[in-house]
């Protein structure tokens, strides 16, 4: 059996980063983690395009348009949806998750779900780099590996 693994090198990769303005104090940290991970793994800043959208519900549409251009090896989606007192959280978080998954499956371009879905602001901040690592950086690493694996499959 042949085992095929991808590298975590972003030298020749071009990524689109889609982030939300909503909950920007949290999302800005995710973006910083994503940019740092991309550069630390050999990516060039000019190969990382950053697109801002109002909120997490708008992320899938922009991610899909970017994936369909064929200009990007992967799209990284970052946002934060924090539970409140109404059902709004369920619709936004579910819509974002389903839309991002469908974008990846429809286009064949890897699309990372880096949208935090938490009960509290504290949980979100912890996942944005304060205590539990930076989920923005983790999303980029997953896309570097996935994009490189797809390149190997296509050879």
Swiss-Prot record:
The active site is at residue 88. (2S)-2-hydroxy-3-oxobutyl phosphate binds at residues 85-86, 127. Its EC number is 2.5.1.78. The keyword Transferase applies. Keywords: Riboflavin biosynthesis, Transferase. HAMAP family: Lumazine_synth (MF_00178). NCBIfam families: lumazine-synth. Catalyzes the formation of 6,7-dimethyl-8-ribityllumazine by condensation of 5-amino-6-(D-ribitylamino)uracil with 3,4-dihydroxy-2-butanone 4-phosphate. This is the penultimate step in the biosynthesis of riboflavin. This is 6,7-dimethyl-8-ribityllumazine synthase. It comes from Deinococcus radiodurans (strain ATCC 13939 / DSM 20539 / JCM 16871 / CCUG 27074 / LMG 4051 / NBRC 15346 / NCIMB 9279 / VKM B-1422 / R1). The gene is ribH.
């Amino acid at each position: 059996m042949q085992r095929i693994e991808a590298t975590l090198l972003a030298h020749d990769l071009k990524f689109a980063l889609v982030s939300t303005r909503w909950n920007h104090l949290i999302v800005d940290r995710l973006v910083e983690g994503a940019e740092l991970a991309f550069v630390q793994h050999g990516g060039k800043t000019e190969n990382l395009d950053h697109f801002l959208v109002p909120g997490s519900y708008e992320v899938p549409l922009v991610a899909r348009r970017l994936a369909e251009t064929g200009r990007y090896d992967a799209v990284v989606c970052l946002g934060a949806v924090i539970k409140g007192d109404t059902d709004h959280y369920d619709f936004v978080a579910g819509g974002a998750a389903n839309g991002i998954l469908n974008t990846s499956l429809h286009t064949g371009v890897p699309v990372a779900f880096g949208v935090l879905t938490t009960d509290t602001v504290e949980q979100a901040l912890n996942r944005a780099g304060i205590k539990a690592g930076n989920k923005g950086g983790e999303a980029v690493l997953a896309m570097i590996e996935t994009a490189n694996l797809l390149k190997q499959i296509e050879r």
